[in-house]
Amino acid sequence: MPGFNYGGDQDEVYTPYRRVLVTGATGLLGRAVYKEFKNNDWDALGCGYNRARPFFLKCNLLDEDAVRGVIQSFQPHVIVHCAAERRPDVVERHTEAAMNLNVHACATLAKEAGGSFLIYISTDYVFDGRNPPYGENDAPNPLNLYGKSKLEGEREILRHCPGAAVLRVPILFGEVEKVEESAVTVLFERVQEGAESCTIDHCQQRFPTYTNDVARVCRNMAERALQDQSLRGIFHYSAKEQMTKYEMTCAIADAFNLPSSHLIPMTEQPAGAGAQRPQNAQLECSRLELLGLSVESTPFKNAIRDSLWPFQHDKRWRQTVFH
């Protein structure tokens, strides 16, 4: 481990000098991970690409020389790899670019990680959703190219960096730059279209999980790994509230005291609805819990309110609730 003896005595770890590199730091999860480490006495370096500057380092993760240069210069004790193409329908349409980011960039990063503890963010979509819940040792069987690309990314990470950790998470939401940034927060648009009825999926079961909670888990894992180099392999983290997108949308309406009578549950998947999704890929998360590394998930209504209140159309609501 750069900077001190990885896995050695605790006395050798000097808190101000703990360094973490966060890839995809401009993205939905990456921003939360970067903030979590930064706010807890870590020297954090975030990198991105299209949206990197001026706050983060611009780095092309497909450029081995660039990746090597960043790691050798910063010498991180921990790397959290959040960068990914995480939109299943986009992966289907732009497969080559998605595979480059979701698979080949993983291989590059893992090869160059050196003594750093590497956490790779993966997905519940590595499972087919036919026999939940899924434990860390259950056999993956992804239904779509996104799930296949993330599974290949896992394999590249663990092949080139056997001491790495894979953290699988479900559908995510959190503080967004625009509501379309998350498949959960985008449902707010349906809520605020109160004048027109709209149908919303009421088939597929989801476990919407707050990015701030995932970020806390990443920091817990990182801090444990500095003391215990046996922390490696596959882990699961998920919120426990089970909802369809219809139920999420109704919960969002309730959180903002908005009507939901215009929302209509759709109980059959329409033909041509994009990439196939698993019916219920619930993650069983006992490994993190047994190690004392899990965190209690933030209740959905609280977290979604914190995430979406800046996008409320009626500005008077903010004054009523927050003042």
Curated annotation (Swiss-Prot):
CDD domains documented for this protein: dTDP_HR_like_SDR_e
Entry keyword annotation includes Oxidoreductase: no
UniProt keyword annotations, A-Z: NADP, One-carbon metabolism
Pathway: Amino-acid biosynthesis; S-adenosyl-L-methionine biosynthesis; S-adenosyl-L-methionine from L-methionine: step 1/1
Gene Ontology CC annotations of this record: methionine adenosyltransferase complex
InterPro entries: dTDP_dehydrorham_reduct (IPR005913), NAD(P)-bd_dom_sf (IPR036291), RmlD-like-bd (IPR029903)
GO annotation (BP), single: one-carbon metabolic process
Gene Ontology molecular function: any one: methionine adenosyltransferase regulator activity
Family to which this protein belongs: Belongs to the dTDP-4-dehydrorhamnose reductase family. MAT2B subfamily.
Protein role: Regulatory subunit of S-adenosylmethionine synthetase 2, an enzyme that catalyzes the formation of S-adenosylmethionine from methionine and ATP. Regulates MAT2A catalytic activity by changing its kinetic properties, increasing its affinity for L-methionine. Can bind NADP (in vitro).
Subunit structure: Heterotrimer; composed of a catalytic mat2a homodimer that binds one regulatory mat2b chain. Heterohexamer; composed of a central, catalytic mat2a homotetramer flanked on either side by a regulatory mat2b chain. NADP binding increases the affinity for mat2a.
Name of this protein: Methionine adenosyltransferase 2 subunit beta
Species, as recorded: Danio rerio
